[in-house]
């Protein structure tokens, strides 16, 4: 199993706007080979931002990689730049291979 995460620093006071964008978006993940699930999680607040992370699980790293090169990925991310005023910097990607679990 592979876990893909993007960390987002969201401008303080824009959290609800950010969450609304995520709730209303078209993911285009239904039926994508190897996709298991997705969560958006909210973390700690800092002086100027609130930390969020997107968390998706995939059958393998290759399944995730294939999705990032797909038309479904391009369509799902085509409007990502429209909300840049909500972010401090760019998202930070982290990928993890699951080595143990319950």
Task: Give the positions of each predicted feature.
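Glycine-rich beta-strand-turn "strand-cap" elements at beta-sheet edges
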Residues: 2, 39-48, 78-102
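N-terminal first-folded block
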Residues: 6-10, 15-32
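Context-gated lysine
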Residues: 9-16, 42, 69, 74, ...
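Non-catalytic surface loops within mature trypsin-like serine protease
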Residues: 10-12, 60, 97-100
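Residue-level signal for secondary-structure boundary sites
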Residues: 16, 62-64, 101
């Amino acid at each position: 199993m592979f876990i893909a995460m993007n960390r987002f620093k969201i401008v303080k006071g824009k959290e609800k706007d950010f969450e609304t964008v995520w709730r209303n978006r078209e993911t285009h993940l239904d039926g994508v080979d190897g996709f298991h699930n997705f969560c958006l999680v909210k973390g700690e607040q800092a002086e100027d931002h609130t930390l969020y992370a997107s968390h998706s699980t995939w059958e393998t790293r290759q399944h995730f990689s294939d999705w990032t090169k797909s038309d479904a990925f391009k369509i799902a991310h085509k409007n990502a730049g429209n909300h840049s005023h909500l972010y401090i910097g760019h998202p930070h990607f982290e990928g993890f291979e699951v080595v143990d679990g319950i």
